A protein has these predicted regions:
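Non-catalytic DNA-recognition/assembly elements of restriction-modification systems
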Residues: 15-16, 20-45, 168, 177
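A short beta-sheet element
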Residues: 61-62, 81-141
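Short, surface-exposed secondary-structure boundary micro-motifs
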Residues: 99, 185-187
Length: 216
């Protein structure tokens, strides 16, 4: 309960920081470009239940994104030939673009390194930046992005995000030096959140162990 509450608070704080950063960016005179000009959108792998195996290619799904980072608590593997174009790369952004729950649509995680034998499912999309930084990943978590995707309320009111919707999204494009500074600052904040979450998880486990010993 405490851990879940902390995760909600940290994500809300991060969203507030992102909104402040991108509002300031938007206030500057930077050129505005379409997202499709600076990133490629790659649809995921279609597979059948008979392809599922105990080993093979890891298929990233919506359950593999937890609190903005990759989670491997619920993994599915397929024994199937996967084209090189459907293998994740370092700094790819994986996004849930279709789900029965509208609240999961739009959630993202950054691929932190080159993960061998890893692809993504049909309800997911890889957004592969053409820029040499993680600026687009942070943009995809900002209110500026969500207000374009979910135009009515700024939150998910649809159950899918299509390439056509992404093609219409615009973002301010600062010079590379400014983008790298923004990316570095926001990424360092992500690291602090992740470290705090790990410490909290360890404390919760320690408390449970102590209670078990106490009431034996």
């Amino acid at each position: 309960m405490l851990y879940s509450y902390f995760c909600v608070l940290s994500q809300k704080y991060k969203r507030g920081l992102l909104n402040k950063v991108f509002s300031n960016i938007n206030g500057n005179i930077y050129p505005t470009v379409y997202l499709s000009e600076v990133a490629d959108f790659l649809q995921g792998l279609t597979y059948s239940p008979s392809d599922v195996s105990v080993s093979g290619y890891l298929v990233l799904r919506s359950s593999n994104i937890q609190n903005g980072v990759l989670s491997f608590d619920d993994c599915v593997y397929v024994d199937k030939k996967v084209d090189e174009s459907l293998q994740v790369k370092c700094d790819d952004v994986i996004m849930c673009v279709r789900n029965g729950s509208k609240y999961l649509v739009g959630k993202t995680a950054l691929i932190p390194n080159n993960m061998a034998m890893t692809t993504w499912g049909a309800f997911m999309m890889i957004i592969r930046s053409k820029l040499n930084d993680t600026y687009i990943f942070h943009y995809l978590n900002s209110q500026m992005f969500f207000s374009q995707i979910f135009k009515d309320t700024g939150t998910a009111t649809i159950n899918q995000i299509t390439k056509g919707i992404l093609n219409e999204c615009k973002l301010p494009l600062p010079p590379e030096t400014a983008r790298k500074q923004i990316s570095k600052m926001l990424s360092s904040f992500d690291v602090k959140i992740q470290k705090a979450e790990k410490r909290l998880t360890a404390l919760v486990k320690l408390k449970k162990a102590f209670l078990q010993q106490l009431f034996i």
